[in-house]
Amino acid sequence: GSSFPRRGDKEYIRKKTEEVFYDPKVATNELVDRVFEIANNRITILKLLGYAKSAIRHNMANDIPKIKKQTCLIWGAEDKVTPPHVAEEFHKLLPNSELNWIPLCGHAAMWEHPKRFSEIVLQFLKNKF
């Protein structure tokens, strides 16, 4: 599709990397360089494509409710890669889940809001274990 990186086009890679975040400034030059490097590594790209194809072939919707363990979902409220309605669906399907929203956050909450992300994880672990 149109979201697959054009490997040699660094500005395209920058644009797509920025789209992952609510705040495009999180996509630093260093991060864009790393994504560009990954996009130009044939072996890595083939593995990523394999994972993507597997995810498409194996819809987990029927298996997710079988997960009985306590589950902490952390979602960027402005995630455009995996939109918030997917978080709501996962939350409904996971019988022992809690859904935590991080406002002003896109797809990669652990990078965009690492402190808040860590606080949520630590609180979940303290409450559950």
Where are these regions (language model features)?
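Conserved alpha/beta-hydrolase catalytic His-Asp/Glu region
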Residues: 7-66
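Catalytic active-site module of serine/aspartate enzymes centered on a nucleophile-bearing elbow/loop
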Residues: 96-129
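Short beta-strand/loop motif that positions the catalytic acidic residue
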Residues: 67, 73-75, 79
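Conserved alpha/beta-hydrolase "acid-adjacent" motif
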Residues: 80-86
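Short, conserved loop/helix-junction motifs that constitute active-site signature segments
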Residues: 65-68, 93-94
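Generic recognition of short, well-ordered alpha-helical segments
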Residues: 62, 85, 112-115
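Active-site-adjacent alpha-helix of alpha/beta-hydrolase-fold enzymes
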Residues: 88-97
